[in-house]
Every structure is written in C-alpha cells, then in structure tokens.
Amino acid sequence: MKKFMNTADDFLKESLQGFGAAHQDIVSVYYDPNFITRSQPTKDGKVALISGGGSGHEPMHGGLVGHGMLDAACPGFVFSSPTPDQMLAAAEKVDSGAGVLFIVKNYSGDVMNFQMAAEMMQGPNESVLTNDDVAVEDSSFTTGRRGVAATVLVEKIVGSLAESGGSLQECKALGDKVNQNSGSMGVAFSSCTVPAAGKPTFELGADEMEFGVGIHGEPGRRRDKIKPAQDITNELLEAIIEDLKPNSNDETLLFVNGMGGTPLTELYLVFDNAKKLLDSKNIKISRSLVGNFCTSLEMQGASITLTKLDEEIAKHWDSKVHTAAMRWGM
C-alpha cells in the first residue's frame, strides 16, 4: 500500500486538519465529534442543509460546505457511516430556527444513523434520500438503489433554494424532485485501498473492469473485459436513459464524475462520447459538470449522471456557489 499517511488511526484527523487550514475562509472544522460547518453562522430563518457519509469520497461532502450548498457535513471514518452524535452536534450548531434538512445517500448505515439523529433533534427536520444508481437494486450496503453522484447535484440545487429563503418543505420537495429526475451509473478499472485495511477492496485483472461498481467498491452488474471508451459510455448512458426515459428535446444536465484516479483528459473524452449518444437521440445537454466530486479514494473509473431539467432545477443550478470544491457566480 502506497499512501500519504503517518498512521491509519490519525489518517482522517490529519486530513480534516489540513482541509480546515487550507479553507479557513470557507469552513470551520470541529472534532470529537467530527463535523464541518461554514465559517460564518447560518443566517436567521434559513433552512440548514446537512449531509455526510464515510470519508474517502472527497470532495463530497466537506468540500461542498459553503454559500449556496451545505451548512454542515459529517465525515465518518473511511467508507464508514458517520455516527448520530456527529449529525446531532452538527445540527445543533447550524440550526437557526427554520429547520434542518438532512441529505442522505441510500446506504444502510447512513440511513439508520441519520434517522436516529433526526429522532433525537428537538426542532423540525426532514430528509431527502438519494438513490440515483441504476446499476443494481440491492447491494451489500443497501436495500434498494444506491445513492451516488447525483447527491452532489441535490446538494447544489437544494442549497440554492435554501439560500434564497425556501421553506423546509419546499427544500425537501425540490431535493426529492432532483433525485427522481436523476440517474447514475459507474465503472471501475481498478480497486481502491482503505488505509485501515491495507489491501485492495477487490481484485481486478489488468484487462478487466467492474461495470456498475458502487462508490465503496461494491460489485456491479458484471465484470467484463476493457472495451473502447465509446462502447463503455454508451452502455452506461443507455442504462440511465432506459431508467429515466427522457423525451426527445428534453433539456438535461450531464455530469461526468471521476472516481479519484482517472485524469481529466479521460473524463472529458467520456463527456464527448456521451454527448455523441445524446445528440443522436435529440436529448439536449444544457448544463454540464466534469470532474472528481464523488470519489472512491484512488479508484480508476468514472460515473455518468444525467438529470432532467425544468426551469426551477436549472435556475438553482445556475445560482451562486462558493465552496472548497465548487465555485461560480461569486
């Protein structure tokens, strides 16, 4: 195992310390329990957005804390769910009286712990569950579909509504709508190594890929031989289109996400290949995002997310955002 680390026990804490020091104008990092908030207090009357999950998926979620997105994020240990006390401490810190919206990826530990935190909270709260992965219905981590890269889009779009004064119920409704109008699927060319484990999560041959892989290395639909990029892209996107059923001339947001170990050169190539398929079906790409946002440590691979847009979703996607990982309009 080759990683920049001192000890596995200190890996997360040192990473959080570095993140906080590098972005102290945007975030504040708290310890025991670990959570991240904006550096400035939540505005009175603003719905507070909180998300979280296992570390190793950076910049999701800590890198998405800031103006126009999250108010707080709860990082668990690598690929392990955060605990209810983290979520409760974060909620108590950022709740300004308008309520708290938890954005939760559909993994059993995340769902259970966020539900426990919600039950312990004194004030009003709601949850949005993301389950955009069309690859499999059930996995070792979930009952039902997994929550993956569309979570980033939910956090951006709902974050905009919350910033503009949307109510708790309005924010939940928009989050549910974005999730329902999004589909994702990924492929891995390599595994990844959790620091505490010291060995790859799974094994892949030099000429193999895991098609439909999860963000923790969960098995996908099948293991196959590497193919040309256009063939891989077409299969990922066709599975999403079959699930979403966009109409001809529908406007969409196309998000090509890196898993952590794939260079941007290749991600833009995938975007080009995806555009060719969507153009052939008269599905319009009116918004786009390319980069490493929902990663799996050093895994080589990529995922594609397609989101059907309406005027409300597009407006909140375009609005100002300033986080460590995403910034425009400021």
Language model features: what each stretch is:
Residues 1-49, 311-330:
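N-terminal amphipathic/basic leader segments beginning at the initiator methionine
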Residues 44-52, 61-74, 136-138, 209-225:
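Gly-rich Lys/Arg/Thr-decorated short loops/hinges at beta-loop-alpha junctions or inter-strand turns
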Residues 57, 64-96, 241:
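Glycine-rich oxoanion-binding loops at beta->alpha junctions
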Residues 73-78, 121-144, 280-285, 289:
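Short, acidic/small-residue loops that bind anionic groups at enzyme active sites
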Residues 111-124, 130, 266-272:
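Short Gly/Thr/Asp-enriched flexible loops that form oxyanion-binding sites at enzyme active sites
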Residues 128-170, 174-181:
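Short alpha-helices
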Residues 164-269:
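Mixed-charge interfacial surface used for oligomerization/domain docking
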Residues 239, 244-330:
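C-terminal non-catalytic interaction/assembly regions of soluble proteins
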